[in-house]
Every structure is written in C-alpha cells, then in structure tokens.
C-alpha cells in the first residue's frame, strides 16, 4: 500500500444519550455499522468506523452515550466512552438541538476542557426546529466552551454532512492509513449481527421494552451451499420482557427474526438461517462478557 500523500485522522463522537451518534456514524460510513433506535443507550461498546475519501481515511469512534452510571454495565459503558478520547485528533460533540439544556452535556464539556483536544460542535436534528433555535443553541454552547468549529446537520436526512466531512478531510494530518481500503469497521462480524437484531427489537417494541437487554451471537456456521446458520440469544431481566418479545403465539419474535434476517442477507449478500432464543437472566448486566454482542 502506498502511504505517500495519504492522510488519516481519528474522531470520537460523544454526546448525551439519543443525540444521534450511531445514525451519524452510519451516514458517514455509508453502511449500517451501529444500531440506530429511538431508545437511549443502545451503543454498548466503542467501535471504530472507517470512511475513505480519495487520499484521506477518516476513522470515527462511536461511543456509548455519557450519563450517570449506576449498574456495573452502565459504569462499563461510560468508562469505554471516556477511553475513546485517548490518542485521537478530534472530539465531535454531538448535540440534540431539542435537548441541549442537559446536565450531562455540561459534564461532557467540563471533561473536554481538560483534554486539550480539538473539539468540534455538531448540532443534530436541525430539520425539526426553527433556524432561530439553532442560532440560540450555538450561542449557548459557545458560552460553555470555545469550539474550533461548529456544524449544523440532520444525520437522519444527510443534511450538512458533506461540510463536516470536507472539514475533517482538510484538517487530517498526513500519515499512513490504519485500515484497509475496503474495511468499514473494526467490530467483529458476530457483533454486527447482534447489533442488527438489537436494532430491530428496539424499533419494533419501542416503549414496551427497556434498553436493559442484550443480544449475543453464539454461533455462525457456514453450510455447503454458502448460506449461514446464525444462532442468537436475547437476554432480558424479567419474564414479562420475555413474554413481550415472544408475542402472541411467537408472532413478535418471528417478525423480529424476519426483519433482522432480511437486513443480514442484504449486508452479507448470502442466504441466512436465523434462529432467535429468548432467555431470562435477572442480573445479566453484571456479566460484562455478555454486553458486547458476541460469544467466542
């Protein structure tokens, strides 16, 4: 690989829960690499997503939303979020324009003040508010911290993304690429598979289901016809949650399985045989090996 003239940078995307971090990462990369749901705290672990633009490789670190941790799982997530700020060029502070008066956002800013990182302000969801509100939020955010640059976007509709990418490409330092040309993430395949199913669960069940569930891909087996057998376990903390996921006569879990199967086949370009199992484990949140989406 010829490194001459190449540029590479790493940017961590931080923000409060449900600010749109995973949606932004997927748009920047051009493929689904992180779960996108209406639920808060759906990103379990930090993940590197890769986007190449001619001679520039942009690496984005999708982080768990930073909030006040209580359980062992939540403390694990927040620790990983702050670990993402080590050894990077930029920190992108993603702000939901309808939820900018947030105490956790102030805590994030206070932490960044002591990091000496190039902090970029990105206001998301501008498609749902008036321009006057956007200006008000920018003014407020700059009263908290002097950001190097500010951008306004709608990650959902792709508004303003090009300007953000152009800036990141322009300011990236010269250096070799860290990932191959065709690589879009450093997450294991089993993790990707679990993320797809977890997204379908949250989107389908929305307010009926808490975020305290985990999907673990326990088996991926290739058949002679090149199709894949995928077995996943959905861990929940209560019998009532299991009942919700299964649905009447198993119709709900069948629906989720079909939707996840469809996405997996589109992404992997192979036929998929997906088997979902729902298990109750009251304190699964204290078993960190089951929080990352895959089993070795």
UniProtKB/Swiss-Prot annotation:
Name of the protein in its database record: GTPase Era
Region annotated G1, chain positions: 15-22
Species annotation: Ehrlichia ruminantium (strain Gardel)
One of the Pfam families matching this protein, by short name: KH_2
KH type-2 domain location: 205-282
Residues involved in GTP binding: 15-22, 62-66, 124-127
Gene name for this UniProt entry: era
Spans annotated as G3: 62-65
Primary site of residence: cytoplasm
Domain of life: Bacteria
Spans annotated as G5: 153-155
Localization, UniProt: Cytoplasm; Cell inner membrane
Similarity field: Belongs to the TRAFAC class TrmE-Era-EngA-EngB-Septin-like GTPase superfamily. Era GTPase family.
